[in-house]
């Protein structure tokens, strides 16, 4: 069982934000919940061992409401 750390972003997360969240899973050996607000509230859960490219391709929303 892993500890969950929560990170917040202003607006849509950039690649740098995703990299930092994935790095935190390795450094702290924990799961990271990345949360942000953009015309609503979004969050994704990043588990240890995932790469930021996979997180970006598979877990990030494809479209946002306008």
Stretches found by the model and what they are:
Residues 64-66:
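Short acidic DE-rich linear segments
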Residues 8, 12-57:
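Acidic, low-complexity, intrinsically disordered interaction modules
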Residues 1-6:
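Short aromatic-glycine-(Arg/Gly/Cys) micro-motifs in beta-strand/loop hairpins
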């Amino acid at each position: 069982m892993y500890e969950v750390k929560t990170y917040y972003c202003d607006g849509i997360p950039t690649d740098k934000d995703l990299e930092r969240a994935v790095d935190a899973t390795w450094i702290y050996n924990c799961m990271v919940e990345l949360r942000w607000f953009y015309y609503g509230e979004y969050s994704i859960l990043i588990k240890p061992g995932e790469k930021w490219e996979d997180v970006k391709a598979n877990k990030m929303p494809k479209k946002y409401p306008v």
